[in-house]
Amino acid sequence: MSDLTICTHSGSFHADEALACYLLKLLPTYKDSKIIRSRDKSVIEKSTVAVDVGAVYNFEKLRFDHHQSGFTETFDDKHDIKLSSAGLIYKHYGKDIIKQRLDTNDSITELLYQKLYDSMIQELDGVDNGVERYPSDIKPRYQSGSSISARVGHLNQGWNEPQDDEIVNKQFEKAMELMGQYFLDRLDYYGKSWLPCRSIVENALENRKQTHSSGEILILDMFCPWKDHLFSLEQEKDIKTPIKFVLFEDTSGQWRVSAVGINLHSFTLRLPLPEEWRGKRDEELSQISGIEGCVFAHANGFIGGNKTREGALLMAIKTLNQSPKTLLE
């Protein structure tokens, strides 16, 4: 058993320190370290690493608290949300953890490091620091009680349940495991599924003028989760005319024409399928559109289907030709 210790605060726990402790124990140096939960100053000072407690941030001394006055650390100069203990540990050790898990080179490690922060860790930083996702004067249409931070919160003892340290510490171990498995699941997804998709989308972007002279239609060599990559690659490559449609073969061997949203999380489309097509199917849709082999056009105009690649491409081209050139460009 290692003599190294990781100290975090006692009492109620949160998602950020649960993940911070788990991340540290992924590292060979700390994998056998003992987790101590205390607010006692002498215990904190004797610990090898202090996380989310102690009112000190000092990487050289392995002190990673963010609650103290004057703390302003962010992930980098492109991010303005202050780090939580999870963000601090990830900032310093995230690349090592990614390389250790996936055996990636430096450029891929950097790409995954940024992606995982933006898609997961930053949320923990925002929640723990009380940063709203949207202006407070906007009333939510429904309650959200199932986020990962909320699920960790639910592991705390209820007000009318025993607050015995042994019980609470056992619950904290569950919180660490919950956060750790969530982190590893996301890391594996981005490394093994999300990342390989990037080259497929990038290849379609490079060939877009061969697909259609407008450069506004992509055809994927195979289906993959393309949306995230499309928006980031458009920005990276400074593409002036936004992509309007992405075509791909579905699992039945038919083809889909998918309209692109104005951003990754919006249901508003850069260019929907024509209104007169929407909600129509099969021969009726083929008659209205003048395109053979039509299968369907969704009632909201965000996706359509055709039996052939050529038919799906014609659906995209006809939509482009019917649209005002100024639309969302």
Swiss-Prot record:
Lineage summary: Eukaryota, Amoebozoa, Evosea, Eumycetozoa, Dictyostelia
Cross-referenced InterPro entries: MYG1_exonuclease
Species name: Dictyostelium discoideum
Name by which UniProt lists this protein: MYG1 protein
One GO CC term, this protein: cytoplasm
Similarity section: Belongs to the MYG1 family.
Alphabetical list of Pfam families matching this protein: MYG1_exonuc
Superkingdom to which the source organism belongs: Eukaryota
